[in-house]
């Protein structure tokens, strides 16, 4: 018997539709009741030990057949009351109307051993009223990617939703991976995602767009009371403080993305968490050879709206859409602008903080922003790996800066040789700056190690684990999870996981760019 205790405040305190079944346009309801659709033979592939501990789940319970049944969608623990949430969103810059949880089903809000609230949500557990024409299922490859990235981002120190479990369904799912008219059968899986809240910008956009200001206000009041309990006051002042905090949290999140080289790939407003958590891991990726114009999403290959370098601007634009949705609650629109200004101020402060940390400086001067920009330009011109370049700077000697320290960061040997003088010039400039800095060599290296990961979840690493899992060997998933639990440490015997993208992976599907097919 589970020790999980559920307190399902969203379902209790927001208006919903208790009717299960038919897919429909839902008006006036924040959520709809829905049951997961049972699968043939659920089996546990992997789980997060840390997340299980927070929830108070013991090893014997996780290993039980009942656990796979529950988190495979075939059974419920006492207190679970499944629902799907209704929301809208802007997708690639255009209003898309009602979207909703098309294949995500929340089982309940559990109270953890730390007293925190943790919503448990199955992704791929079958259709909901918001599935439109889809089957509500998920394939193994996308589920592995979401499971691994949720935990990898947490251990990198990036605000994120978490993952408890990855369960195979024992059933096949038909997907057209490349949208080229050649669908194939793939193994199915279900991820249990975990977060204090899965509320999105789109939860406020939809009622506002429909003119349902009463429901909009209910969403805002509920979100503040449950998820922002430290905020005090009432009326517009309270709403303004809340919006400013949402803006601040979003800025912190995106700054972390830029620090570690993460590209979300689909920054639609329905994929933006009101808590400033990274959410919805689809066609994401990590920057290999540095390119601010790179996106891993094939759907965005031409417009590149969500490319790496524009993520801060897109986040600001998305917050503008949220402000627009909240505007009916404000007589004084200037209060919303204050929140948007808070985003910019917070992001710039985070950028300066991260610049100092990545370069091993006590503080970031204005000229240090120019210094790191010059390095980025050099990385782009010379096809240098972002992660390996910054990690390689840790052991650089300020007295004798040697370009050989960064040899492994180059993808093109010819460019390494041609651009060697420019790199040497930059390193000398950097070394001179280090000699002006008050940090000791030990303090500098320690600071840099905490800002520059050695291991990131490169797409080719995830794809190798997927390939093995699809052949019946899930050990690669567990091994990769273990490596990503300590991304800033030098792990003995695991150099292969820190290597730059191999040549064979440059253009292979799943290793460079990905579709939204999942």
Curated annotation (Swiss-Prot):
Domain of life: Bacteria
Annotated keywords: ATP-binding, Magnesium, Manganese, Metal-binding, Nucleotide-binding, Nucleotidyltransferase, Transferase
Signal peptide range in chain numbering: none
Key word Translocase present: no
Catalytic-site annotation from UniProt: 270
Region (Disordered): 1-25
E.C. no: 2.7.7.-, 2.7.7.108
Keyword check for Transferase: yes
Enzyme class: transferase
The protein's required cofactors: Mg(2+); Mn(2+)
Basic and acidic residues: compositionally biased ranges: 1-10
Binding positions (Mg(2+)): 271, 280
Entry-linked InterPro entries: SelO
Reactions performed catalytically: L-seryl-[protein] + ATP = 3-O-(5'-adenylyl)-L-seryl-[protein] + diphosphate; L-threonyl-[protein] + ATP = 3-O-(5'-adenylyl)-L-threonyl-[protein] + diphosphate; L-tyrosyl-[protein] + ATP = O-(5'-adenylyl)-L-tyrosyl-[protein] + diphosphate; L-histidyl-[protein] + UTP = N(tele)-(5'-uridylyl)-L-histidyl-[protein] + diphosphate
Binding locations of ATP: 100, 102-103, 123, 135-136, 193, 200, 280
MF-aspect GO terms: AMPylase activity; ATP binding; magnesium ion binding
Family: Belongs to the SELO family.
Biological role stated in the UniProt entry: Nucleotidyltransferase involved in the post-translational modification of proteins. It can catalyze the addition of adenosine monophosphate (AMP) or uridine monophosphate (UMP) to a protein, resulting in modifications known as AMPylation and UMPylation.
Full protein name: Protein nucleotidyltransferase YdiU
């Amino acid at each position: 018997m589970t020790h999980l205790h559920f307190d399902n405040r969203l379902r209790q305190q927001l208006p919903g539709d208790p009717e299960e079944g038919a897919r429909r346009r839902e008006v006036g309801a924040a959520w709809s009741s829905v049951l997961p659709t049972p699968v043939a033979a659920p089996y546990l592939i992997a789980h997060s030990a840390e997340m299980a501990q927070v929830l108070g789940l013991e090893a014997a319970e996780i290993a039980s057949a009942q656990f796979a049944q529950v988190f495979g969608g075939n059974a419920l623990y006492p207190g679970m009351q499944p629902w799907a949430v209704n929301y809208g969103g802007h997708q690639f810059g255009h209003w898309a109307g009602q979207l909703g949880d098309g294949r995500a089903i929340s089982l309940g809000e559990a109270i953890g051993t730390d007293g925190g609230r943790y919503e448990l949500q199955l992704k791929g557990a079958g259709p909901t009223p918001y599935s439109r024409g889809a089957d509500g299922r998920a394939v193994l490859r996308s589920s592995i990617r979401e499971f691994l990235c949720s935990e990898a981002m947490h251990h990198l120190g990036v605000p994120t939703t978490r993952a408890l479990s990855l369960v195979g369904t024992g059933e096949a799912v038909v997907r057209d991976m490349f949208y080229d008219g050649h669908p194939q059968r793939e193994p199915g899986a279900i991820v249990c995602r975990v977060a204090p809240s899965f509320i999105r910008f789109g939860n406020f956009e939809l009622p506002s767009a429909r003119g349902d200001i009463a429901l909009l206000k209910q969403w805002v009041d509920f979100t503040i009371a449950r998820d922002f309990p430290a905020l005090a006051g009432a009326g517009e002042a309270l709403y303004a403080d809340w919006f400013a905090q949402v803006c601040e949290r979003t800025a912190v999140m995106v700054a972390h993305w830029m620090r570690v080289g993460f590209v979300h790939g689909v920054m639609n407003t329905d994929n933006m968490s009101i808590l400033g958590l990274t959410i919805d891991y689809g066609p994401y990726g990590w920057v290999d050879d540095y390119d601010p114009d790179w996106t891993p999403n094939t759907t965005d290959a031409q417009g590149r709206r969500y490319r790496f370098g524009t993520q801060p601007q897109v986040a600001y634009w998305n917050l503008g859409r949220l402000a627009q949705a909240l505007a009916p609650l404000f007589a004084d629109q200037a209060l919303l602008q204050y929140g948007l200004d808070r985003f910019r101020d917070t992001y710039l402060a985070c950028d300066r903080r991260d610049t100092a940390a990545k370069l091993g400086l006590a503080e970031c001067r204005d000229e240090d922003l120019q210094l790191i920009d010059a390095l980025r330009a050099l990385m782009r011109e010379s096809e240098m790996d972002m992660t390996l370049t910054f990690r390689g700077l840790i052991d650089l000697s300020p007295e004798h800066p040697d370009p050989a320290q960064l040899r492994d960061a180059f993808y093109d040997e010819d460019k390494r040789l041609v651009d060697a003088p420019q790199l040497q010039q930059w390193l000398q400039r950097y070394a001179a700056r280090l000699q002006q800095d008050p940090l000791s060599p030990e303090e500098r290296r320690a600071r840099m190690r905490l800002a520059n990961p050695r291991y990131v979840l490169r797409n080719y690493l995830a794809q190798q684990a997927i390939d093995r899992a699809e052949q019946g060997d899930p050990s690669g998933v567990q091994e990769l999870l273990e490596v990503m639990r300590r991304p800033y440490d030098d792990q003995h015997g695991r150099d292969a996981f820190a290597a730059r993208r191999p040549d064979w992976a440059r253009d292979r599907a799943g290793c460079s760019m990905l579709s939204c097919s999942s």
